[in-house]
From Swiss-Prot:
It comes from Burkholderia lata (strain ATCC 17760 / DSM 23089 / LMG 22485 / NCIMB 9086 / R18194 / 383). InterPro entries: His_Pase_superF_clade-1, His_PPase_superfam, PG/BPGM_mutase_AS, Phosphogly_mut1. Pathway: Carbohydrate degradation; glycolysis; pyruvate from D-glyceraldehyde 3-phosphate: step 3/5. GO terms for molecular function: phosphoglycerate mutase activity. Catalyzes the interconversion of 2-phosphoglycerate and 3-phosphoglycerate. It catalyses: (2R)-2-phosphoglycerate = (2R)-3-phosphoglycerate. It holds the Pfam family His_Phos_1. GO terms for biological process: gluconeogenesis; glycolytic process. The active site is at residues 9, 87. Gene3D superfamilies: Phosphoglycerate mutase-like. Substrate binds at residues 8-15, 21-22, 60, 87-90, 98, 114-115, 183-184. The lineage of its organism: Bacteria, Pseudomonadati, Pseudomonadota, Betaproteobacteria, Burkholderiales. SUPFAM superfamilies: Phosphoglycerate mutase-like. Homodimer. This is 2,3-bisphosphoglycerate-dependent phosphoglycerate mutase.
Amino acid sequence: MYKLVLIRHGESTWNKENRFTGWVDVDLTEQGRNEAYQAGELLKEAGYTFDIAYTSVLKRAIRTLWHVQDKMDLMYLPVVHSWRLNERHYGALSGLNKAETAAKFGDDQVLVWRRSYDTPPPALEATDERAPFNDPRYAKVPREQLPLTECLKDTVARVLPLWNESIAPAVRAGKQVLIAAHGNSLRALIKYLDGISDSDIVGLNIPNGVPLVYELDENLKPIKHYYLGDQDAIAQAQAAVAKQGKAG
């Protein structure tokens, strides 16, 4: 049996302001930093250790990983930073308040943009300053692979090459792997691992800063998964994530 631990970054400044964030590189709030430290404490108390970690190239995930490593005294851990673990790109919605957007376009439309599998939000213009083309962190990524918007289907297609070519081989080699990433890049990976249908994935909400443990068989198929921590508090956090895109 193998174990894989996933963690969504702690609360970010735009999580707190209820904005669509995507690839915009916002930082953690004080609460987000505390959530990351608490995640590290939970993992340490439960006896976990790691051989390698994966994260995105966005600071809210990177800093979450730092805090977890710090709490676990694993600052020396090898870390792979990959744009493939970035949050889903929210296109022209990036920076907009979710509730205000729902009030303008309707709860149903915003739910489709936030949670449907194959309907992306309106795209950015290529000349928009939020477009990734001139960002140095993506200088080595072929331009045609950089998105101006994404649906979850696109995010799955982006995440899976990293899983197949790097993460899965590390797990099979017996390494203890930690992934610190984002709500939708983790939803994409979970959809693949659990074989969740395109329709059912709409209802999957991942709370900030809570370790999610997957136990996998020899074929890397899930045996079971569970969150570490107070289960009632985790359920409340999941419900809060689900309500973010509603007008009232």
